[in-house]
Curated annotation (Swiss-Prot):
This is Ribosomal RNA small subunit methyltransferase A. Belongs to the class I-like SAM-binding methyltransferase superfamily. rRNA adenine N(6)-methyltransferase family. RsmA subfamily. It comes from the Bacteria. S-adenosyl-L-methionine binds at N16, L18, G43, E64, D89, N110. The gene is rsmA. GO terms for molecular function: 16S rRNA (adenine(1518)-N(6)/adenine(1519)-N(6))-dimethyltransferase activity; RNA binding. The keyword Protease does not apply.
Length: 268
């Protein structure tokens, strides 16, 4: 990064710029971009990953919120024919405007940790467009995404991400790889949306509602946390033990509960 392109990281944007060349190379090797790929980078920052992605020959769209980074990114990459920059909030970005074919978009990002969870949920709403996603996230968030039932990490994020995607915790990254160093460890995760959902719900919005309601009071039993949505008999009819706590249920059980609620809403 030359002096011309220096930029101070902003706390309000959750900026921690990746600078470790070894980590950058490891991420690029995990992505393995090809010239025929359609890439979307969220939060390119100072372009640590951007250059390597462009060197693959793939078409690259980038979305950056910080207006002060726009001239820096344009100064470095605007001459590249496969570079297209969008200034705006990725949380509000309409991915359909990219004109990507179904299951063609490869999404990459060193995501600001303060918006990573809502951004993941926004991307899951567009899962039909996405081939895969590679993100740098807070290690704790990746562990929650990849968690299984029965532990404290299993929750709303785990269930909804695993409903849509196969999750791979690839490797961890220490604070020293960033400037300024964050106070937490980071990790790279790969998310691959399913072509065919292994546990399809009748209405994924109802599944989201059931999961949210259940984990709002995760230490209580299901018959207590879901009492405003389902009776104890309806929970039992779903093949679920109402005396269990939410963290003890797997994804398939939550889908059965959601389908019971969907049927109940239709018949009422």
């Amino acid at each position: 990064m030359t002096e011309q392109y220096q930029h101070r990281a902003r706390k309000r944007f959750g900026q921690n710029f990746l600078h470790d060349a070894g980590v950058i190379d490891k991420i690029l090797r995990a992505i393995r971009a090809r010239p025929e790929d359609r890439l979307l980078e969220i939060g390119p920052g100072q372009g640590a990953l951007t250059e390597g992605l462009l060197d693959s020959g793939a078409q690259l769209d980038v979305v950056e919120l910080d207006k002060d980074l726009i001239p820096i990114l344009n100064g470095q990459f605007a001459s590249k024919p496969n570079f297209n920059l969008h200034q705006g909030d990725a949380l509000k970005f309409d991915f359909n405007t990219l004109g990507a074919d179904p299951r063609s978009l490869r999404v990459v990002g060193n995501l600001p940790y303060n918006i990573s969870t809502p951004l993941i949920f926004h991307l899951l709403q567009n899962a039909s467009l996405i081939r895969d996603m590679h993100f740098m996230l807070q290690k704790e968030v990746v562990e929650r995404m990849a968690a299984g039932p029965g532990g404290g990490d299993w929750g709303r994020l785990s269930i909804m991400v695993q409903y849509h995607c196969r999750v791979e915790h690839l490797f961890n990254v220490g604070p020293g790889a960033f400037n300024p160093p964050p106070k937490v460890d980071s990790a790279i995760v790969r998310l691959v949306p399913y072509e065919t959902l292994p546990h399809p719900a009748k209405d994924h919005r109802v599944l989201e509602r059931i999961v949210r309601e259940a984990f709002n009071q995760r230490r209580k039993t299901l018959r207590n946390t879901l009492k405003l949505l389902l009776t104890s008999d309806e929970i039992t009819a779903s093949g679920v033990d109402g005396s269990l706590r939410p963290e003890q249920l797997d994804l398939a059980a939550f889908v059965r509960l959601a389908d019971t609620l969907s049927e109940k809403v239709v018949t009422e």
